[in-house]
Amino acid sequence: MSTTQGGSNQQDETRRELIIQKFKLFRREGNNLEFVDQSGQKLRCPICGNTVFIEDAERGQIVCASCGYVLMEHILDTGPEWRAFTPEEKEDRARTGGPLERVTSEELVTRIETTLKSPDLKKKLEILKYKKWQQRIRVQTSYERNLVQATHELNRIAHQLGVPKSCMDEALAVYKQVLKSGLVKGRSVEAIIAACLHMACRMQGMPRSLDEISQYTRAPRKEIARCFRLIARELRIRLPLSDPRQYVPKIVEQLKLPGDIAKEAIRVLEEAKDKGLTAGKDPAGLAAAAVYIASLLKGEVRTQKEIAQAAQVTEVTVRNRYKELAKELNIKIPIK
């Protein structure tokens, strides 16, 4: 009896380890979680088939929201043990520095600062000479030099796009795989890192279009798209299909529209998906049309031109998708 129970526990542990390796967090709403694999398939409870799980922080478990099956346990809480209610309290009570970052190549390295207030020109030239030698010593191999160049380019593009740190970390992780695979040889570092960032944003559920990314890099859009397909094929990365709903928050934020516009736009997109209207359509164009419809329904009107600019699509795309959705979903737009 005990042997059978021990075998069952071992099987459960093996299953949980496989889940951790294969799946990653897709959506979080409060304590409710959903996970997907690289192909976009949702993780299902092995007992009841449910796809929604609950995080029990007190017990360190993730359980099925339907039947209570324990999917993962012994999850460590990496947050602080203290509580803070203001930014000042948080700063006062923190006892550690920031974590090491993948997006920087200067972890735990003392840098020679060249911005001196001293007017002494001789001193400044001496410091610049030391700085130059420090850079030569630190970056020795071609791999390191390439990585530093890519990191600087990634930081520049990401800053222009306003993407979060998680996307930058993911992009650099993908780029390191590309670099180790020898795919960078003979290709533009700018195009490769831009393709990695596009891929990372989709992985993190915060997509940025190739048109949007190509605005902030010297690499042409076609070259970035070519590199993107090469990376996905050679590294066998299967990305989930772009969800139009993921484009809505960015459009709404840029247009400074209220939150209920986003909710209404997402409702329109979900209804369109149920009726099979989203297949084969540009997700950014669909999201733009849904936001336009929501703005008309809620009385927070924005022009098609404004919405097209926020979504990085053409006015014609917004107009065509708007007409399709309004007709097929039988949406009555109030005339003012």
UniProtKB/Swiss-Prot annotation:
UniProt-listed PANTHER family: TRANSCRIPTION INITIATION FACTOR IIB (PTHR11618:SF13), TRANSCRIPTION INITIATION FACTOR IIB-RELATED (PTHR11618)
InterPro entries in alphabetical order: Cyclin-like_dom, Cyclin-like_sf, TFIIB, TFIIB_arc, TFIIB_CS, TFIIB_cyclin, Znf_TFIIB
Protein's UniProt keywords contain Phosphoprotein: no
Protein family membership: Belongs to the TFIIB family.
Gene Ontology molecular-function annotations: DNA-binding transcription factor activity; TBP-class protein binding; zinc ion binding
Annotated positions binding Zn(2+): C45, C48, C64, C67
DNA-binding in keyword set: no
GO annotation, cellular component aspect: transcription preinitiation complex
Origin superkingdom: Archaea
ZnF segments: TFIIB-type: 41-72
Keywords: Metal-binding, Repeat, Transcription, Transcription regulation, Zinc, Zinc-finger
Name of this protein: Transcription initiation factor IIB
Biological role stated in the UniProt entry: Stabilizes TBP binding to an archaeal box-A promoter. Also responsible for recruiting RNA polymerase II to the pre-initiation complex (DNA-TBP-TFIIB).
Repeat (Sequence) residue spans along the chain: 152-235, 246-327
Natural source organism: Caldivirga maquilingensis (strain ATCC 700844 / DSM 13496 / JCM 10307 / IC-167)
GO terms, biological process: transcription preinitiation complex assembly
